[in-house]
Every structure is written in structure tokens, then in C-alpha cells.
Amino acid sequence: MITLDIQNKLVEIVGASYVFTDEETLNEYGKDHTEDLVFPPSILVKPASAEEISAIMKIAFEYAIPVVPIGARTGLSGGILAIHKGIGLSLERLNQIEKIDEENLQVITQPAVITEVLQQAVAEKGLFYPVDPSSKGSCFIGGNIAENAGGARAVKYGVTKDYVLNLEVVLPNGEIIWTGANTLKNSTGYNLTQLMVGSEGTLGIVTKIVLKLLPAVQHNVLLWIPFFKMEQAAAAVSAIFKAGIVPSALEFMERDAIEWTSKFVEVPDVYLKPENEAHLLVEVDGNYPDILMIEAEKILSVVEQFQIDEVLFADTSDQKNMLWKLRRNIAEAVKQNTVYKEEDTVVPRFELPKLLIGIKAIGEKYGFKSICYGHAGDGNLHVNIVKLDMTEEAWKNQVPKGVKEIFELTKSLKGTISGEHGIGLVQKEFMPIVFTDVELHLMYQIKKIFDPKNIMNPGKIFPSTYNH
């Protein structure tokens, strides 16, 4: 419970202008992009420094008040939903890039810098931050840390964890630590940095981030490859890698995903034909155009072994931007059309055809339609289960059964239930599908060491039986 005394203490720390108790503001900060769920905190604070956050956490720790870190609210797993009320701690004022280190190819940034803003800032110095989530124009770097975000270029360049060198973190008791060192190598003790990445705000609050950068890449070639059968598109993915090509992006989109999105963003009809069940969007990048064209031709020779239609080589910036606009707006297009649930399955890429066929069969069994797309190059398939004309009873009763079977199928294919969206609130009850009791217990013991009073984003990641 937030008493008037506690509220006054929070005001003393951040100032009255940055403490909010009105219903409208609390509701706005009590939702992200997860379905239509709203869980507002009891009070919202907007600190401006690690020191202010430390002072807030000391109060929360003393009075055992839940604290939910809040970023850009673009998440898809309910990670910022304050299901136990308490303090909503918005990081939006920690929004500065502190240093771009051109000598060491590093950047030091605060957590509320928008991912695309950081990418553009380092690009001006001839550097490259590859992590490329679809929400890069609005999501925060801190949120990328919390979820271990990936995106289209993860297939070649890796995900967030591959670029995080060091983190400043405020612990649940208010202590401030650095998790590692600003070095490419570190074999000194347990890796606290990597433990924090993907921890979804359950272990501490990240207040400063040191990221590795790469030299900028100068050129890319983009192919739009239509397939008559969606399982053929899925099968072509591993064949491209087997031929010795590692694309910088390899995206799968089934027909409905493209059709809905083309209307949503007004993409010309030339990119879609009625007889095509799915497309692959394949990019190769590098500094030598001649080599890229050789790689593109090799990809073409691979996919010609499958049932494909005419391939488009996107050779202008307008074409490339339009195709990426199409891909990046699928989730929003689905959201505009119907109520939906989005799952984030990931399997070894060779198993993609089995996963795709299985998902469609499960949908038929339980009476729901799914729209599939995703980062096929790393086996990550987003499954949008859409309500359309399903009854409310069927939506509430049949869909959860189908989701459970989809996750069981994913596990049987040596995959897991989230590739980049995280577990948060909406997936936590499915964790026993992929982890044994022993494995879950080990993870929960780590949580308890960091957070003995269970105040740090409680009710997330672990099944309900663990949150006590």
C-alpha cells in the first residue's frame, strides 16, 4: 500500500512534477502492446538518475512495495503490467547517449534512448549497431536489454546479448553495481552482465549500458521471393544456409500477413499475387557489391529448386524501404483487423516446415486461424492467432488449449516458447513445458538472491506457484 507518507518521500526524491497518482496517467502506464491488458500501478514516478532510482528502491525495499520498471511500453508479453500494483518506475528521463567511443567501437547509453536513434547516432560516426527489432522506431535500448531483443538481422549479427559489455544496475535493495567490464573478453567470475540481459526487470533496474559496435556496412541486396506453397518457403530457409550463404536478414511471411499489411501501409499490388502462399524476404550485406551479387545469384539458384514464382531484386532504395515497411508493419496490420494473440516460437531452422504445418493443423483442430511470419533465418516464427468471427466462448476456451499444443510441438522440435518477446505475464504458466522443476527452481533461487522480498517486477516469468 502506498501511504501518504511514502508518496511524500517519493516526491522528495524526484519532485512533485514527476510523481503521478491520477487514473488516466496510471492506466496509460499500465499497458503495453500485449493484447488489451491493463494493470495500472498505484503510483508512477519518473526519476532522472541512478541515484534517484536507488533512493526509490531503498524505500520500496524497506516497505516491501512492488516496483515495475517501465520503458517505451512496446512489449508483447505483459512485462510492464503492474499486476501487484505498487510503484511504476518509468525510465523515460534517462534518455541520453553519453559517449560514442570511436576508438574502441563502443557506445555508453542510458536506457531510454530509442533504438533507432542510437543506430542513427553511431551511423554518423561510421559505426553500426545491428540489433534491429521491428519496433526500433519506438522501443528503448533498456527494453531491448530486458527482453534480449533480436530482430531481422539477428540471423547474421546476433541478438542484444551479443553486444552488451557492461551494465550499471540498481538492485532491489537500492545498491548500485556494475556487472562487468568494458572489454570484449571477460573470464572473471560469474557473468552477471549476461544474467541481467533478458531478465525482464525481475532482478534489478538497468540505468547505464555499454554496447559493442561494428564498422558500418556499405551495401546490401534485397530479394523478394514468392513461393506457391508456404511449407516450401520454410524448407528453403535451411537450404540457403546449407549452400554456404549467411544472409543479413531472412524473413518469412505467409500470404494473409502480406495481404493485410499491404492494405494497411498501401504497398503496391505488384508485390503480391493470388497464387503465392508465402514469401521470403532475403538480404545480404557487405562492402563489395560484386560479391553481394554473386551471393544473391547463389541464393536464387538454391530457391529455384523449390516451387517459386518470379523473384524481385529490389535495386532501388524506394523498393527496399517499401518491402521492409511491409514486413515491419505486420503486427500493427493484424491488430487493426481483429483481436489477436501473438506467440513467439523458435526452433532450429531445419524444423520450420514441421512447425508451420503443425501450427496450421492445431488451428484446424481448435477452430482458429493463425497468421504466421517472422525471422525464419534463425527459426523464429511469430504466430498471430486471430479471433475474426470466433465466439467469445471458443476464444477463451479453445485458443489456450491450442497455444499449449503449439508450445508442446515447439519443445518437441528442440525449440522454445519465446525467441525475443520474453515470458512476462502472458507466457509464464507455460514455462513448465520447456523447463523441469529442477531447472525452474534453480532460476527462482537466483531471483530470490537478488530480490529476497520479491518486490522487483513480481508475478513475471515464473508460474503462479513460484510467486510467493
Where are these regions (language model features)?
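Short acidic/histidine-rich active-site segments
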Residues: 375, 416-423, 458-459
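Activity-critical C-terminal alpha-helical subdomain
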Residues: 175, 428-468
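Conserved, mostly hydrophobic/aromatic
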Residues: 60, 383, 451
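C-terminal substrate-recognition/cap domain of FAD-linked oxidoreductases
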Residues: 21-29, 215, 224-226, 234-402, ...
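N-terminal accessory segments
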Residues: 1-33, 62-65, 302-318, 412-417, ...
